[in-house]
A protein has these predicted regions:
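Early extracytoplasmic/lumenal segment of secretory-pathway proteins
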Residues: 9-17, 27-138, 143-146
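VWA/integrin I-like adhesion module and closely mimicked acidic/polar interface patches used
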Residues: 302-311, 535-583, 587-592, 596-604
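Von Willebrand factor
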Residues: 413-482, 509-510, 528-532, 565-568, ...
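Periplasmic-binding protein-like
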Residues: 146-159, 242-256, 304-336
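Ligand-binding pocket segment of bilobal, Venus flytrap-like solute-binding proteins
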Residues: 222-316
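A conserved helix-loop-strand patch within extracytoplasmic ligand-binding domains
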Residues: 137-210, 222
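Short beta-strand-loop
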Residues: 430, 457-497, 516-520, 541-546, ...
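Extracellular/periplasmic juxtamembrane helices and adjacent flexible linkers that interface
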Residues: 2-39, 55, 331-421, 432, ...
Length: 608
């Protein structure tokens, strides 16, 4: 395996991809309305019907499933549990797959640390299994997954676009793809008679963190080379291919670890009557288009019908160059704790999932069947085309995939970021079972995050509490500058020197940080503030919350800067931070369990 490099996103892309595996990160919840059930491969499963099906006897199977299908599988598991397999009662528990799952498998699963051990893993895509096998081979260890991993359901990658915009490009009659988006990114919507829509803006997740981002990145390389299969390392290194991919990447508004950020922000814009102003397109799975159009961007069946359908629906563009499927493989682990009895239940549950009634349930939630057949929801009326995709791409070999991720790290849109860290007195509180304070954990997480920035990025650092610089609640520790060796050393030194003192001057600092980045805005970069706090505003002479939000709205009308906030510790004002992030079309992250801060920082930096 490649060793970590001192380059942003060239930091062992396999390591990053393997650790997150396109799933949730243990201890972390992106605070945009998603359901938090405490589940996760390695998290505690929620109590439900299947946990009592065999009254504590028989064979219990734990399935770790990717987010988009976890709730559906949980319901199926509850219906399945109680069956007899090999003369024993079988019960199946479904948890949400997490990044910590693979890390725990790699080091040797510790139930005290990692929670219940999974017996089956069903990520969104087989690509993650290929990466895991590659990692095992590189470290000369046995792979915890075999080579036979049948699909339980499928959904192709599409380019989702507000319907009026897609129709302006010729949808549904005209074949469209990545090359069309590249051309559009070079001009604007004025070329298509809609100057009011402004520049073309693409939403795409980070390929190290998200299946849709990974498949979209692979798809752009195929489009760049004109190939439909057998992508090679040489193809990925081709200068013309790199130029094509870089052109697509530079139309990005920001990246991230989940498409839910884009879809939730788009829903809020639509609610406000500005659904054509946020993004022009976003790379998502086909199922997500239906979920969004039902007013349910989380895709959680329990929230379906609780929000109105959008005024401006999305439609799916199936890239004419070909696309990849998220195939939801079903991988029975080859670890020592998966004995013959569990294997028998795993095989029987797979048969159950692939049977007609369960396949209908998948297709009733806008998945395609395990063999790729569309159900009744895949219709043009729903913005989906059942005859598509006409061309299907196969994931490249793991070594080529590694090259794709490394190349993307060099070609992605650069970042222009200000990190703002709360150093109020409460940050000195000790975090149980760690031997460290909240500030010490946050400093280490921020230092670790620096390794993910590189020489194309610019990063600066502020600290804040109250009256840090005269009457100002904040103090610049390192100006925003190119992340060369000197700046990296400067940032690390300033972070390590932070000490806790004072109150929390949140509102004044937030607006000042936003304006600071606004004044150094780069049209060629993702401009953002990363704002971490463990408290609530305690400066009585500061702006009010309404004043802060009004100021952010005014500034947002100029050049776009996004404020990604982190609610750190139980006393953080999560509701306020959510409002700050929403008004800047970003996202708030929940780290109320301070031990999760390193993982949270990783997720936040995935936006750049």
């Amino acid at each position: 395996m490649q060793q970590p490099q001192r380059r942003r996103r060239n930091v062992a892309p396999f390591v990053i991809a393997i650790l997150v595996a396109g799933s949730l990160i243990v201890g972390l919840r992106l605070f945009i309305g998603s359901r938090d059930d405490g589940g996760g491969g390695g998290g505690k499963p929620a109590k439900n019907a299947e946990t009592a099906a065999c009254e504590g006897k028989g064979v219990r199977l734990t399935v770790a499933a990717s987010l988009e299908k976890a709730e559906l599988l949980r319901k199926m598991a509850a219906d399945y549990s109680g069956r007899k397999v090999g003369g024993q009662c079988a019960e199946v528990t479904v948890t949400r797959s997490s990044g910590a799952l693979i890390q725990a498998l790699a080091r040797g699963w510790d139930e005290g640390r990692d929670g219940p051990r999974p017996d089956v893993w069903s990520p969104a895509s087989s690509s993650w299994l290929a990466l895991l096998r590659q990692r095992a081979a590189a470290s000369d260890t046995a792979s915890p997954v075999s080579g036979d991993n049948p699909s339980v359901a499928k959904t192709p990658l599409v380019i989702a676009m507000p319907k009026p915009m897609a129709e302006a490009l010729g949808w549904p009659g005209k074949k469209l793809g990545w090359s069309d988006l590249l051309e559009l990114s070079k001009s604007s919507w004025a070329k298509y008679g809609h100057p009011e829509w402004g520049a073309f803006r693409l939403g795409k997740t980070n390929p190290n963190f998200s299946t849709s981002g990974l498949n979209a990145t692979i798809g752009t390389y195929f489009a760049a080379t004109g190939l439909s299969g057998d992508l090679t390392e040489r193809n990925v290194a081709d200068p013309e291919a790199r130029k094509f991919v870089q052109g697509v990447e530079h139309s990005i508004v920001h990246y991230g670890d989940t498409t839910l950020t884009f879809l939730s922000n788009l829903q809020r814009a639509d609610d406000a009557g500005t659904g054509l102003s946020y993004i022009s397109a976003v790379a998502v799975e086909e199922k997500s288009v239906w979920d969004y159009n039902e007013g349910n961007p989380t895709g959680d069946p329990t929230t379906l019908g609780k929000h109105p359908k959008p005024k401006v629906p999305l439609v799916a563009i199936y890239p004419k160059e070909g696309t990849l499927y998220s195939d939801s493989p079903y991988a029975v682990l080859t670890t020592p704790w998966v004995d013959d009895a569990k294997r028998a239940v795993a095989a029987d549950f797979l048969t159950y999932l692939q049977a007609a009634p369960q396949q209908k349930e998948f297709t009733d939630h806008a998945f395609r069947s395990h063999d790729g057949k569309p159900g009744k929801l895949i219709t043009q009326a729903n913005g989906l085309l059942p005859a598509e995709p006409r061309s299907t791409l196969s994931p490249p070999a793991p070594n080529v995939l590694d090259k794709v991720l490394s190349s993307w790290a060099e070609l992605r849109k650069p970042a222009n970021v200000l990190m703002v860290i709360d150093v109020s007195g409460s940050m000195g509180a000790q975090v149980p079972d760690t031997g460290k304070s909240k500030l010490e954990l946050a400093k280490q997480a921020a230092v670790n995050a620096l390794t993910q920035f590189g020489p194309h990025d610019q990063v600066g650092l502020w600290m804040f509490s109250t009256q840090r610089d005269g009457d100002r609640d904040y103090l610049e520790l390192a100006p925003i500058a190119t992340v060369d060796d000197a700046q990296r050393k400067r940032l690390r030194s300033r972070l390590e020197g932070l000490t806790p003192d004072g109150g929390t001057g949140l509102y004044d600092t937030a607006l000042a940080a936003y304006q600071h980045v606004q004044g150094r805005h780069s049209g060629e970069a993702i401009n953002a503030v990363v704002f971490l706090t463990d408290g609530r505003n305690e400066d009585n002479d500061s702006l009010s919350l309404d004043g802060l939000l009004a100021g952010l709205r005014t500034e947002q009308s100029r050049e776009s800067v996004r404020m990604f906030t982190i609610a750190y510790g139980q006393d953080a004002d999560l509701g306020v931070l959510r409002k700050i992030s929403e008004v800047t079309n970003a996202a708030a992250y929940d780290s109320r369990e301070p031990g999760s801060i390193d993982q949270v920082f990783t997720a936040v930096v995935s936006n750049f």
